[in-house]
A protein has these predicted regions:
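Positively charged n-region of N-terminal signal peptides that target proteins for export
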Residues: 1-5
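Bacterial N-terminal signal peptides
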Residues: 7-16
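Substrate-binding cleft of extracellular glycoside hydrolase catalytic domains
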Residues: 22-40, 52-144
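Functionally critical loop-and-helix segments that line ligand-binding/catalytic clefts
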Residues: 22-32, 163-225
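Sec/Tat-exported extracytoplasmic proteins
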Residues: 46, 54, 73-76, 102-106, ...
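Structural detector of well-ordered beta-strand residues that form the stable sheet scaffold
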Residues: 80-82, 112, 147-149, 169, ...
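Aromatic-lined carbohydrate-recognition surfaces of secreted/lumenal glycan-active proteins
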Residues: 143-155
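Beta-rich nucleic-acid/ligand-interaction surfaces
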Residues: 153-163
Length: 225
């Protein structure tokens, strides 16, 4: 059997059964952990969209983003960029770090904010206020509503239900459906594996489902694409 077909089958077999038989559109998210990526092969393996890490906190940039970002577009993938949020770093400084690396074009997906770790001690009230500020700053800068990425146990222990205006990207593995996350009635994107195998990526990679078609996903993107 041709190698490309084998890899495409491996990707399909690693996905959970569709939740309630809904339409799900496959994507991946990457960072420097994945090393060099052959995005043309990723696209050929049946991946429709992808996110690449751009920045972390108020100073760190991902060293692979400058290569990944144009290559994703050249390969024909619907692309997005994400920021690894650092609790305790000033929201305005985190915005400056992300915008230094990311210029969005029409058709690009909205920024995703990865909220999964409490790096510095901070009271719950201040932590919630800072995240609201950062998300509002992102929305004002790019003109699209950012996506919140998190995992149920961390979010439910540290945040409240006041973020439901933002689409939810939930991470939970080895289950038929992710647990509820405080504030949301359902998820928009589900990261269902952190150990996927995809042609063009030489290391395990995060696999994601968007709940809907690719055209539905593009409705979240920067207008004009």
């Amino acid at each position: 059997m041709p190698k490309l077909l084998l890899c495409a089958l491996a990707l399909c077999l690693s996905l959970p059964i569709a939740v309630n038989a809904e339409t799900l559109t496959s994507g991946v998210d990457v960072s420097h952990d994945q090393g060099p990526v052959d995005w043309a092969k990723v696209k050929g393996a049946g991946v429709d969209w992808a996110y690449a890490k751009a920045s972390e906190g108020d100073t760190v940039g991902d060293q692979t983003f400058a290569t990944n970002w144009p290559a994703m577009k050249s390969a024909g993938l619907t692309r997005g960029a994400y920021h690894f949020y650092v609790v305790g770093d000033p929201p305005k400084d985190q915005l400056a770090n992300f915008t230094k690396h990311v210029t969005l074009e029409p058709g690009d997906l909205p920024p995703m904010v990865d909220v999964e770790r409490k790096q510095h001690p901070q009271g719950r009230t201040a932590m919630i206020a800072d995240l609201h500020e950062f998300l509002s700053l992102l929305k004002a800068h790019y003109g699209v509503t950012p996506i919140v990425y998190t995992e149920p146990a961390f979010w439910n222990a540290n945040f409240d239900g006041s973020f439901s205006d933002y689409p939810l990207w939930v991470a939970e593995y080895g289950v038929r459906a992710p647990r509820p996350v405080t504030g949301w009635t359902g998820w928009t994107i589900w990261q269902h594996s952190e150990s996927g195998k995809v042609l063009g990526i030489n290391t395990p990679v995060d696999l994601d489902h968007f709940k809907g078609t690719l055209q539905d996903l593009k409705k979240l993107a920067v207008p004009g694409g």
